[in-house]
């Protein structure tokens, strides 16, 4: 679960204590999404009697977050990394000492098993490429703001020539 940095709650358990600050609701995304199921589990596991999960959509959730940020109103949303909202605002995950949401996840590069034989340069490049969730989020924010994906990639490359050079060695 994600909150703006100005929100007082630090842990999921704190949500009960601060429920009135955000009208006792967690703004979610589409019902049935994995993060929504985990949030329902967290509400039960942390005994959050004053909290309701409100399904919506990804765009509706980020619209609610935008409004809350503009007025500095507390809000709790479901979320994940990478996502452009982390490049837009100072957000943080609430601590989850019961580990309801599990360990941090990662993104892997997957390629056809024959790629190394057919295109060794491409395979070598894919093995070297690495970028942080923050970097991905920044590119996602450009795209969300209307920059074409290829132009967003060009902008990132222009700002990070040393990184790209390492990948191309």
What is each PLM-predicted segment?
Residues 1-9, 105-118:
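A bilobed periplasmic-binding-protein/Venus flytrap-type ligand-binding module shared by bacterial periplasmic
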Residues 1-32:
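A conserved helix-loop-strand patch within extracytoplasmic ligand-binding domains
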Residues 6-9, 29-34, 56-59, 116-117, ...:
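Soluble non-cytosolic domains of exported or imported proteins
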Residues 8, 15-18, 41-52, 73, ...:
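Metal- and O2-centered redox machinery and metal/ROS homeostasis
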Residues 12, 16, 36, 40, ...:
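Extracytoplasmic/secreted envelope proteins and their assembly/folding machinery
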Residues 14, 117-129:
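Short amphipathic alpha-helical coupling segments at ligand-binding clamshell hinges
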Residues 30-98:
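Ligand-binding pocket segment of bilobal, Venus flytrap-like solute-binding proteins
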Residues 133-169:
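C-terminal functional modules
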